[in-house]
Curated annotation (Swiss-Prot):
Gene Ontology BP terms: L-arginine biosynthetic process
Keyword Cytoplasm: yes
CDD domains: AGPR_1_C_LysY, AGPR_1_N
Matches recorded under InterPro entries: AGPR_type-1, NAD(P)-bd_dom_sf, NAGSA_dehydrogenase, Semialdehyde_DH_NAD-bd
Record organism: Lactiplantibacillus plantarum (strain ATCC BAA-793 / NCIMB 8826 / WCFS1) (Lactobacillus plantarum)
Name of the top EC class for this enzyme: oxidoreductase
Active site: C149
Protein name, as recorded: N-acetyl-gamma-glutamyl-phosphate reductase 1
Localization, UniProt: Cytoplasm
Metabolic or biological pathway: Amino-acid biosynthesis; L-arginine biosynthesis; N(2)-acetyl-L-ornithine from L-glutamate: step 3/4
Assigned EC number: 1.2.1.38
One CC-aspect GO term: cytoplasm
Keyword Cytoplasm tagged: yes
Length: 339
């Protein structure tokens, strides 16, 4: 199948290109970058300087998208896809979108977090929100929106508790993230980040309503705090909650086991000494999850790679499932970066 990558010079776009180089079913024939248009892809992306693939693929302007693509992955910066979406859908029938645009349909939420999306009114656009482990495809949709990286980690942590109604409604989400989560355009310098750890967003973040939306009406108030770590990639999410009276630790453990036992890319850790770690999941499409209960309180933690499971990896996973391929096609050789 011929596929395209929109926004291929960013971190997520580059990871998509890397994953698809060896994918047996998806062949990248178009990749866009306004900054590098006309230049060889593997000379502009630093991670490919010595791999010797020599595909002779060059970056193109988004306006040059051809008509012969089966589908595209969009890793365009937030706010860009809405400006081009109608033209894109005239040339291809399906977009797997890893940016924030089109995740919501509620006008109030869009106005606050994604005003560019709100400005688009078209009967041509049919979008859906898709979590590979929990969602079914809407085959009428032409934009399949993948979760944001921090939202996804938080959803994995909280979902078994909320789905099985084991906790009181209100939860608090605490997320630590590496610098690549901000993309290449971050204004923060290395001197600001090196050796530092800080709160960068409390209670107001565009992933917050996404978490609430995915967890549904059973969840109450969702508190949120995001912290910057002095690492390049990785997300560590902790969800704090109070379990309901009569709920035991065994009930909680069973809920996590039942939820994730058949999930290819979510590892539910059960051993007493086993805990989610960034070094176990960075470089892979896996998420690790574990819940601990003590005196009526529950802490559920998740680790994942924000650029893979939180973006490019889950997009490839979703495309595999959409086209009824083996779920881990093109993802099965990724190993963690240890130590």
């Amino acid at each position: 199948m011929k596929v395209g990558i929109l926004g291929g010079s960013g971190y997520a776009g580059a990871e998509l290109y890397r994953l698809l180089l060896n994918h047996p079913n998806f062949n990248v024939t178009f990749i866009s970058s306004e900054k590098y248009a006309g230049k060889p892809v593997e000379k502009m992306l630093k991670g490919f300087a010595h791999n010797g693939h020599s595909h002779n693929l060059r970056f193109n302007h988004l306006d040059d998208l051809p008509f012969d693509l089966d589908f595209v992955f969009s890793a365009l910066p937030t706010g860009v896809l809405p400006k081009y979406v109608e033209k894109i859908l005239e040339k291809t029938s399906l977009i797997f979108n890893v940016s924030g645009d089109f995740r919501f349909k509620d006008a109030t939420t869009l106005q606050q977090y994604y005003p560019e999306t709100l400005a688009i009114e078209s009967d041509q656009i049919l979008s859906s929100y898709y979590i590979p482990e929990f969602s079914d495809f809407d085959k009428n949709a032409n934009i399949i929106n993948l979760p944001g990286c921090m939202a996804l980690a938080s959803i994995y942590a909280a979902y078994p508790l909320v789905k099985n109604k084991l906790i009181n409604p209100n939860i608090f989400v605490d997320v630590k993230t590496g610098s690549s989560g901000a993309g290449k355009s971050t204004k923060e310098t290395a001197a600001d980040r090196f050796g530092n750890f800080r709160l960068y967003r409390a209670f107001n973040h565009r992933h917050l309503p996404e978490i609430a939306m995915a967890l549904g009406s059973s969840v109450g108030k969702v508190g949120f705090a995001a912290y910057s770590l002095d690492i390049s990639r990785g997300i560590y999410a902790s969800v704090y909650s109070q379990i309901k009276k009569g709920v035991t630790e065994v009930d909680v453990k069973k809920a996590y086991f039942k939820t994730y036992k058949s999930c290819k890319f979510v590892a539910n850790l059960t051993g007493k000494q086993s805990v989610p770690m960034l070094k176990s999941t960075n470089g892979t499409n896996f998420a690790e999850v574990k819940a601990t209960v003590h005196e009526g309180q529950c802490i559920a933690v998740v680790s994942l790679d924000n650029l893979l499971k939180g973006a490019a990896g889950q997009a490839v996973q979703a495309a595999n499932k959409y086209y009824q391929l083996v779920e881990d096609t093109g993802l099965d050789t990724l190993a963690g970066m240890w130590p």
